[in-house]
């Protein structure tokens, strides 16, 4: 046992010297590259107790190498965490690449979406959500996914799904209905895409209300995208829809999306590009 302790003390008090290292005027070992100490003296009391007067210390280049290594490891861990959040958080894999960095900047509501991310702590604390409403193809889903991606980059867990997926999951789930909904509501932010497009059956509406109501009671923010108009949301056609819409509009600040249909514009751009390529090929023959 005594030999083991002595070996341990020797190990923690011995510095390995490189060929270019040298002993300074203070008797300590110095790095031959950065010329800073690779040793430091113990206090007098500690030196007497250990029987050694010095211990290894990081020179400047060792410290720089360690910090660089730790930064790389931290970055890799962050990338793996974000990748896992995106894999779990997006039910549609294509949305993983929908980010502010890839945005074309043409949507006037981009600033509103960025503001949500920048103010996340406040939005979370005050339970403030968004209701993106407007015509088809105006960028609602894209900017909602941008918010999700940006928060995931901050290592915030977000779930972006839709009621078609939720209803299918509930029908096929081996876990109980309550457990599934509780898991959905455990996310700091829940995003429901294409709200209002789900089946209008009695069962379907009951499940929609259950999810919305559970989220409301959780006190956590919700973002929803919908093609419904604000008029339709504020004046629903029947009581089941009224219950759902009332909960939704009480949780989310309405944000209107207007303008051209980006999907149609993209399709037109592709068509024009195709015509250009065909013309170039014809001219080259």
Question: What is the meaning of each model-derived region?
Answer:
Residues 108-117, 148-189, 199-206:
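Short glycine-rich substrate-engagement loop in P-loop NTPases that contacts/grips substrate
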Residues 1-104, 267-285:
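A short, basic N-terminal segment
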Residues 194-195:
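Walker B catalytic acidic pair
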Residues 61, 105, 163, 257-259:
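Active-site donor-binding loop signature of nucleotide-sugar glycosyltransferases
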Residues 127-131, 157-158, 189, 221:
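Residue-level preference for the first positions of well-ordered beta-strands
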Residues 124-144:
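Walker A/P-loop nucleotide-binding motif
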Residues 88-91, 96, 102-130:
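Pre-Walker A (pre-P-loop) alpha-helix and adjacent loop at the N terminus of AAA/AAA+ ATPase modules
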């Amino acid at each position: 046992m005594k030999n083991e302790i002595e070996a341990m003390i020797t190990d923690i008090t011995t510095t390995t010297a490189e060929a270019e290292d040298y002993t300074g005027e203070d008797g300590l070992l110095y790095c031959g590259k950065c010329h800073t100490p690779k040793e430091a003296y113990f206090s007098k009391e500690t030196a007497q107790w250990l029987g050694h007067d010095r211990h290894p210390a990081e020179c400047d280049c060792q410290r720089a190498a360690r910090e660089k290594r730790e930064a790389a490891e931290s970055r890799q861990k962050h990338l793996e965490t974000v990748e896992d959040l995106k894999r779990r958080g997006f039910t549609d894999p294509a949305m993983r690449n929908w980010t502010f960095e890839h945005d074309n900047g043409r949507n006037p509501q981009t600033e509103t979406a960025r503001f949500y991310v920048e103010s996340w702590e406040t939005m979370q604390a005050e339970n403030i959500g968004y209701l993106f409403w407007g015509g088809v193809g105006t960028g609602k889903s894209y900017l909602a996914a941008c918010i999700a991606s940006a928060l995931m980059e901050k290592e915030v867990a977000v779930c972006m799904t839709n009621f078609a997926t939720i209803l299918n999951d509930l029908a096929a789930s081996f876990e109980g209905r309550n457990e599934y909904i509780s898991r959905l509501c455990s996310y700091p932010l829940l995003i429901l895409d294409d709200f209002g497009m789900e089946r209008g059956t009695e069962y379907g509406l009951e499940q929609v209300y259950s999810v919305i109501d559970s989220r409301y009671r959780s006190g956590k923010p919700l973002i929803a995208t919908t093609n419904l108009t604000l008029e339709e949301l504020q004046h629903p056609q029947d009581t089941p829809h009224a219950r759902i819409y009332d909960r939704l509009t009480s949780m989310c600040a309405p944000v209107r999306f207007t303008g051209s249909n980006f999907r149609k514009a993209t399709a037109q751009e592709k068509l024009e590009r195709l015509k250009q390529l065909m013309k170039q090929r014809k001219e080259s023959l």
